[in-house]
């Protein structure tokens, strides 16, 4: 039976390159698990591989949402599970590539999403309108520090959703998620790229500089014409949020660059914390030869 391979780890650690290498070795197809690469036109700012960089490897779950659409982990899960099972039915190996934590978990684990209640949600949305997202996120931190650690403090939708789940279940939001010691769906093997700040931080700064040099601002300007706004899932993405703020005169371009770098580093710390808690991950050194190490772990070298 074909076994999917998941490639996880922090931003700028080389997941896409490792995914391509494994797909070549294993006759695989890539399923994207980066939430922002799901959006059409969000290319430069998400380091989405170009068609040429995909080296003839089929990719799924890229460019499937308009920037006006609200992200949905449940929708992604349904669509991506169908992709994985289709790839397996054709005798090919699904290579799941991405670092979006909840999206990875929704795919690798059989996550049954908790209930919703429109009245409870409306109450928290009213609270959000009254005190603002950062103050509401602070309340989430008091109730459930682990959930707050993986939800950005400028993300109103996920903050409200976490509070709704906590009230409805009487448990922390994290308790609604599958345990990280359960067998992964399909027996998926999870390969993680291990990095150090000393190695990764310069790569983050270099990548951010390259984004701006390659036309990131023009990309955002084009997406604004397609309906991108600051108060949306896509508009809150790291980098896009800062460019939109600079375009609106709310910060300088120098600040936009620096805040993109610091925002990415902050996100990387959350990714490290999240994936380090998952003992099913087999780690390879991102600064060495991760492909050879991964193949050895998989018993293929």
From Swiss-Prot:
Site (Interaction with substrate tRNA): 100, 121
Example GO BP: tRNA modification
Pfam families (alphabetical): IPPT
UniProt KW keywords: ATP-binding, Magnesium, Nucleotide-binding, Transferase, tRNA processing
Swiss-Prot/TrEMBL cofactor(s): Mg(2+)
Superkingdom of origin organism: Bacteria
Top-level EC class: transferase
Reactions that this protein is recorded to catalyse: adenosine(37) in tRNA + dimethylallyl diphosphate = N(6)-dimethylallyladenosine(37) in tRNA + diphosphate
InterPro entries: Dimethylallyltransferase, IPT, P-loop_NTPase
Keyword Glycoprotein annotated: no
Residues annotated as binding ATP: 9-16
Region annotated Interaction with substrate tRNA, chain positions: 34-37
One example GO MF annotation: tRNA dimethylallyltransferase activity
EC code: 2.5.1.75
Residue positions binding substrate: 11-16
Record text on subunit structure and interactions: Monomer.
Family: Belongs to the IPP transferase family.
Function: Catalyzes the transfer of a dimethylallyl group onto the adenine at position 37 in tRNAs that read codons beginning with uridine, leading to the formation of N6-(dimethylallyl)adenosine (i(6)A).
Entry protein name: tRNA dimethylallyltransferase
Lineage: Bacteria, Bacillati, Actinomycetota, Actinomycetes, Mycobacteriales
Gene: miaA
């Amino acid at each position: 039976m074909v076994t999917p391979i998941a490639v996880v780890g922090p931003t700028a650690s080389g997941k896409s390159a490792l995914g391509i290498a494994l797909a070549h070795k294993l006759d695989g197809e890539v399923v994207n698990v980066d939430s922002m690469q799901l959006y059409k036109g969000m290319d430069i700012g998400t380091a989405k591989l170009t068609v040429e960089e995909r080296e003839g490897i089929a990719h799924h779950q890229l460019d499937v949402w308009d920037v006006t659409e609200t992200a949905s982990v449940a929708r992604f899960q349904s669509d991506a599970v169908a992709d994985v099972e289709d790839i397996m039915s054709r005798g090919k190996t699904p290579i799941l590539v991405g670092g979006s934590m909840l999206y990875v978990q929704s795919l690798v684990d059989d996550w049954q999403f908790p209930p919703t209640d429109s009245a409870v949600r409306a109450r928290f949305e009213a609270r959000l309108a009254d005190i603002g997202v950062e103050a509401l996120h602070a309340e989430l931190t008091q109730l459930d520090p682990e959930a707050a650690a993986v939800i950005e403090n400028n993300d109103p939708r996920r903050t409200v959703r976490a509070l709704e789940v906590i009230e409805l279940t009487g448990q922390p939001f994290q308790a609604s998620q599958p345990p990280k010691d359960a067998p992964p769906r399909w027996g998926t093997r999870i390969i993680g790229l291990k990095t150090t700040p000393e190695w990764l931080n310069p790569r983050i700064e270099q990548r951010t500089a390259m984004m701006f040099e390659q036309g990131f601002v023009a990309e955002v300007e084009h997406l604004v014409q397609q309906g991108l706004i600051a108060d949306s899932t896509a508009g809150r993405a790291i980098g896009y949020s800062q460019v939109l703020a600079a375009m609106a005169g709310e910060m300088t371009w120098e600040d936009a660059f620096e805040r993109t770098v610091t925002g990415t580093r902050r996100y990387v710390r959350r990714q490290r914390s999240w994936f380090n808690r998952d003992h099913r991950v087999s780690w390879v050194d991102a600064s060495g030869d991760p492909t050879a190490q991964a193949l050895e772990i998989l018993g293929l070298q």
